[in-house]
Amino acid sequence: MRMRIKKGDLVEVISGKDKGKRGKVLRVLPKEDKVIVEGVNMVKRHQRPIPQLREGGIIEREAPIYACKVMVVCPACDKRTRVGYRFTEDGKKVRYCKKCGEIIDKD
């Protein structure tokens, strides 16, 4: 199944411990069917210091979350929505909001 989520999309978590949180997609992992969302599914990692590069300690970072647990938030109506595909007049394939019909891809 094709992933309808892209890097930079605003998404909302629909289930799990972070339900209701919104964040920007930092990375998409299509082979694993997961995404990394800013500020969601935070885990603590113990990091060893490397003298020239970084200091050690416990750092908090985002872990991947299954793509089926997030929904794209439409920038026009500000609601979470399913995403559809359609072609514009010039033949370009774009994603659109199935609730309000507005185009999500503005690039």
From Swiss-Prot:
GO biological process, alphabetically ordered: translation
A molecular function GO annotation: rRNA binding
Keyword Repeat: no
InterPro entries to which the protein is assigned, alphabetical: KOW (IPR005824), Rib_uL2_dom2 (IPR014722), Ribosomal_uL24 (IPR003256), Ribosomal_uL24_CS (IPR005825), Ribosomal_uL24_KOW (IPR041988), Translation_prot_SH3-like_sf (IPR008991)
Entry superkingdom: Bacteria
Alphabetical keyword list: Ribonucleoprotein, Ribosomal protein, RNA-binding, rRNA-binding
Pfam family, one: KOW
PROSITE patterns: RIBOSOMAL_L24
One annotated Gene Ontology cellular component of this protein: ribosome
Protein family membership: Belongs to the universal ribosomal protein uL24 family.
Function in brief: One of two assembly initiator proteins, it binds directly to the 5'-end of the 23S rRNA, where it nucleates assembly of the 50S subunit.
Subunit composition and interactions: Part of the 50S ribosomal subunit.
Annotated protein name in UniProt: Large ribosomal subunit protein uL24
